[in-house]
From Swiss-Prot:
Pfam families: CTP_transf_3. This is 3-deoxy-manno-octulosonate cytidylyltransferase. Belongs to the KdsB family. The gene is kdsB. It comes from Hahella chejuensis (strain KCTC 2396). GO terms for biological process: CMP-keto-3-deoxy-D-manno-octulosonic acid biosynthetic process; lipopolysaccharide biosynthetic process. Keywords: Cytoplasm, Lipopolysaccharide biosynthesis, Nucleotidyltransferase, Transferase. Activates KDO (a required 8-carbon sugar) for incorporation into bacterial lipopolysaccharide in Gram-negative bacteria. Pathway: Nucleotide-sugar biosynthesis; CMP-3-deoxy-D-manno-octulosonate biosynthesis; CMP-3-deoxy-D-manno-octulosonate from 3-deoxy-D-manno-octulosonate and CTP: step 1/1; Bacterial outer membrane biogenesis; lipopolysaccharide biosynthesis. SUPFAM superfamilies: Nucleotide-diphospho-sugar transferases. It comes from the Bacteria. GO terms for cellular component: cytosol.
Length: 255
């Protein structure tokens, strides 16, 4: 297994769930569950990156490590780059970005994405996907789709249904073409530190702006992104109050 560092960006502000990292799930703040999943991955080091003292206090309260960051980062990737500099990581080291609202993320996926990046030295980023089985998901703009080549490198990410089955999709009542597998992107990333340092020097690109997908900035610059099918289906994260109640119910049964 390759050595890697996990950084969990955590913000207190959320338009739909204020204070989301500190919301209680089965007697612990959400961020504690995310940290537990990170520990199960056997990462070399784990940090929560935040600009909020309340989150830092909670993390230190359960024995976690915290990196305090600036509050003006436009994205989680920019926050990771600051952390890499704070930790003085070498350019060839691997950092995995684990979202702070994924309390049930299987640890196997964290290790999978880190190992995939280590095994593909030509890539600057590695990420995961899962097969789409229904037309509703394929046409849902909140589900990001990805197309990859035979070597497992991303060709494009989009909120639109890609690739477009020209003849098949003319029938609005049809399901999915049986001759092609469509994939939904799973938002877990492993980065080479050198890429992170380059990323923050690049301005936003037109594709990133129109799709609102920051990984397109890397593609615009020609950075190869390795995409693998997730070894295990990941449960949905927590974006809404309904998500929170669903996760609470599931974790209450398992505790």
């Amino acid at each position: 297994m390759s050595a890697f560092t996990i950084i969990i960006p955590a913000r207190y502000g959320s338009s739909r769930l204020p204070g989301k990292p500190l919301l209680d799930i089965a007697g612990k703040p959400m961020i504690a569950h995310v940290y537990d999943r990170a520990r199960e991955s056997l990462a070399k080091r784990i940090y929560v990156a935040t600009d909020d003292a309340r989150i830092a206090e909670a993390v230190e309260g359960f024995g976690g490590s915290v990196l305090m960051t600036r509050a003006d980062h436009p994205s989680g990737t920019d926050r990771l780059a600051e952390c890499a500099d704070t930790l003085e990581l070498d350019d060839d080291e691997i950092v995995v970005n684990v979202q702070g609202d994924e309390p049930m993320l299987p640890a196997e996926l964290i290790s999978q994405v880190a190992n995939n990046l280590a095994a593909n030295p030509q890539a600057g980023i590695a990420t995961l996907c899962e097969r789409i089985h229904d037309r509703e998901t394929l046409f849902n703009p909140n589900a990001v789709k990805v197309v990859k080549n035979e070597a497992g490198m991303a060709l494009y990410f989009s909120r639109a249904p890609i690739p477009w089955a020209r003849d098949y999709f003319a029938d609005a009542d049809a399901g999915l073409p049986p001759t092609y597998d469509f994939y939904r992107h799973i938002g877990i990333y492993a980065y080479r530190v050198g890429f992170l340092r380059d990323y923050v020097t690049w301005g936003s690109c037109p594709l990133e702006g129109i799709e609102s997908l920051e990984q397109l900035r890397a593609m615009w610059r020609g950075v190869p992104i390795h995409v693998d099918v997730a070894a295990k289906a990941p449960p949905a994260g927590v974006d809404t109050e309904a998500d929170l109640q669903r996760v609470r119910a599931v974790m209450a049964k398992s505790s």
